Amino acid sequence: MNSLITIKNVGVSYAMQPHVLKDCNATIEGPTITGIIGPNGAGKSTLLKAILGLIQSSGKILIDGESPKKVLHKIAYVEQKSQIDFTFPITIRECVALGRTVKKKPFQRLTKEDWAKVDAAIEEVGLTDLASRQIGALSGGQFQRVLLARCMVQEAEYIFLDEPFVGIDMLSEKVIMTIIRKWKEEGKTILMVNHDLSKVKEYFDQVILVKHAIVASGKTEDVFIKKYLDDVYGGSVYIPQGGEQHA
């Protein structure tokens, strides 16, 4: 089933910081892997949170024709690791199981089938041997894999990821990207904030280029070009033919 996110004239302002985002317009048709890219402080994470309905915004955001708050059951969200309390005394298995509780009614216990899905997700991210380990003892890459396993058991149609590759090892990045591609094959729509430009063409089907507004959006090959990147990064991005991109 095709999915659709519509962003119309969206803006975000704060009392001490007006126009964090203004006049944002884009359409995301899924299944797809879409990257939100732009320089530091450009409003990438703010846009993601606005689409989720986590912060107040002007304009209109629709997910499958509904407001975000009406379709929260379709969405899984992984925030930046810097915003998560690693000291909370919980194991990998318990953390992943929290994702399954969103499928249940209040105070409804997890069933054997639920726990089987939890264990299968932990196995898929390669952490079965560590399932009883406290999350505070994990590396950044291991913990990010735990968060993706938690998304798996939610069985959401939309996956929103805020900087999932920051501070992780290459193995974890490979595991995570394999899972993300599998999600797309299953018909899911993934929207991901990303500051690293080196793998934009490899990772994303579509790109939203942000600098306090949506400068351009669409297929990666149409947006990730010198014309738009110069507008956003001030000419500091070098794009060699067939090579990597550097800011």
Stretches found by the model and what they are:
Residues 1-23, 85:
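A short, flexible loop at the N-terminus of ABC-type nucleotide-binding domains that lies
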Residues 59-71:
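Conserved ABC transporter NBD signature motif
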Residues 111-130:
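Conserved ABC ATPase "signature" region
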Residues 134-138, 142:
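Conserved ABC ATPase signature
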Residues 159-163:
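Catalytic Walker B motif of ABC-type/P-loop ATPase nucleotide-binding domains
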Residues 194-195:
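H-loop/switch region of ABC-family ATPase nucleotide-binding domains
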